[in-house]
Amino acid sequence: MRKILKLKIGRDELVFETGFMAKQANGSVLATYGGSSVLATVCCSNNVREDLDFVPLSVEYNEKYYAAGKIPGGFIKREGKPKDKEILVSRLIDRPMRPLFDKRFGREIQVIPTTLATDQLNPPDIVGMNAAFTAVFLSDIPFNGPIAAVRMVYLNGKFIVNPSFEEIHDSDLDIVVAGSLNGITMVEGGANEVSEDILLSAIDGAHEYIKQICNAQKEFLDIVGEKEKLPLAFEEKIFEFKEELKDFIYTDLKEACFVKGKLNRDKAITLLRNKSYEHFSSLEKLTDSNESLFYKAFDDFEREIVRNSILNDKIRTDGRTPNEIRDIIAEVDILSRTHGSALFTRGETQALAVTTLGTSIDEQIMDDIDGDKRLNFMLHYNFPPFSVGETGRLMTGRREIGHGHLAQRALESMVPGKNDFPYTIRVVSEILESNGSSSMATVCAGSMSLMSAGVPVKRQVAGIAMGLISEGDKYVVLSDILGEEDHLGDMDFKVAGTKNGITGFQMDIKIENVTKHLMRDALEQARIGRMHILSVMDTVISDSRVGISKYAPKIVQLQIDIDKISLVIGSTGKTVKAITDEFEVKVQIEQNGKIILFGDDDFKMQKAKERIESIVREPKVGEIYEGIVKKINSFGAFIELTPTKEGFLSTRLKSRDNKYGSGRFGTGNRYPRFGGGDNIRGNVGLVRPPKLEEGQQIKVKIIDIDKFGKIDLEVVRDKDY
């Protein structure tokens, strides 16, 4: 039976509906905000696995073109593989939900939010998040909900919840926040150098709306009726010889956990793990049924040692204090033929960023249900297996897309717009080593690479990843976390920004929620760390280079009247093609009359610009042109002034008192001009004309333009005849 619940959030009502679509799923909810609707379903497998120590959750957000009344572009007229946007929204849904599933459930869980309609005013991603959270909460799958999400922007000094696309575009802060009744579970967004106080205020305001949606979900559950929850697949089992294992390894494991260097530390821990495995195998205390419990017990002891050292002694596995940042080495211009390059090394994490400048032809065209877009700034993040000393496939996965998007958001508010810098900009980050915080190393390397390439960025940007170790009310915030601190800790909070404020951030937690006080501490510690990193980067490069690389394409711009565009293009593109071929340039003509020339030769580009200016220039009486004789007849000669303009050189000799003499044109004859000089047969003011042939260049002057635009010319002479 169809059930409906409505609540007002911001400018529109958020509507939840269930019981009439996709009823065979474990849970299904249709959520609508304004004119945007998303159907979310959740299903679980019937196969139970007791050997899982993680939640086998997959989220597949997808958008249908029919939702916007569109048909997919390209040859294949159906939706294909997930676009980057769909992957990013899937991650937004996955990350706050994952910690709230019970690992003991032991079944594969799949959540599929599908955008069925969009009004192109309200972004469907937030609608999809709430549809998915509500579908799981109403289902029979064990889930520690409810949770909800909203988007907040900061625009003209005010916070707006669930803004329109236009408000997002114009805002100084765009943040997506997910949370429960008790606190925040996920934060992600970008900003234009906002302060920590503004960010915290946005999160605070978002949580108030989140609590309203969570309470509405509980009310909806009462209306629909709570389903009997599926049983957990297994109870938490403990390795029966755990205390013996502790006695055997604990002292040695304490030493191994604090060996200097990631590879050496991993090697020491692995040797001890193998040694203890062989020991318990020899005692016949390991079987197929408890082998996984043995490894879990070993990992639990490692986790306990590392966390206790940080909480109680404030010492991390590499010997640093909680707020200490690893040694930083920064370099620029390390690749000779690229347009810009930088290498950023922080401890055992290293990112090589390379900037390439292209033309508007290189822009990325996005065929999207929210409207087609053209991106002239892109950042691509690559994480090859050798960066962690492993073998594997070279491929772009969801993690690479997510990390690249975060780094791009951190940098894009500092990148100039098309009007100020009409290049397409692509930054590629190659992670050469990784031991934590590679996405923030990408931000640092990318910022320096842009400056190296001569991109006039507003300010330098740096990023840092913060961690958390907590036990009850006791907690320690960590600066510049290692990979193992991310794995064993409770939070991964990435913050990027300039000296003036924050430009990008992302927070994920593994505990139920974090408090405002804890977030304030983390942001302040991140700010201090960011200032330190920026100071190191500024010693290498602090401002963008003046001028771009000699290997980058050159650009010349000019503005013409809109009604002159057709003159530049010419019949069937003849004129613009001639310019392209003659001067070896690419010509981009925009609808507003802006013309951009791309090429490699400055001289040829300047000549191409002059040619276009001459084409669109309105002729005036008294102007002098280097014309070409196009046609000669008995009445005169037609002179091409520009590819789109001709003037007429009359056959009759004109004197200074505007009286005409006699004479006829013909190839090889001499023709008249007005302007004095030698006399012919004693007639004052009549001059001996030059000899002309078709195709010949001749210097002429405009002497008259009638109301119909007809141009009369006279010959300009450099010397007397």
Curated annotation (Swiss-Prot):
SUPFAM superfamilies per record: Eukaryotic type KH-domain (KH-domain type I) (SSF54791), Nucleic acid-binding proteins (SSF50249), Ribonuclease PH domain 2-like (SSF55666), Ribosomal protein S5 domain 2-like (SSF54211)
Keywords tagged on the record: Cytoplasm, Magnesium, Metal-binding, Nucleotidyltransferase, RNA-binding, Transferase
Top class in the EC scheme: transferase
Residue ranges of domain S1 motif in the record: 622-716
GO biological process annotation, one example: RNA processing
Catalytic activity: RNA(n+1) + phosphate = RNA(n) + a ribonucleoside 5'-diphosphate
Keyword Cytoplasm applies: yes
Binding residues for Mg(2+): D486, D492
Designated name of the protein: Polyribonucleotide nucleotidyltransferase
Compartment(s): Cytoplasm
Nucleotidyltransferase is among the record's keywords: yes
Gene Ontology terms: cellular component: cytosol
Its EC number(s): 2.7.7.8
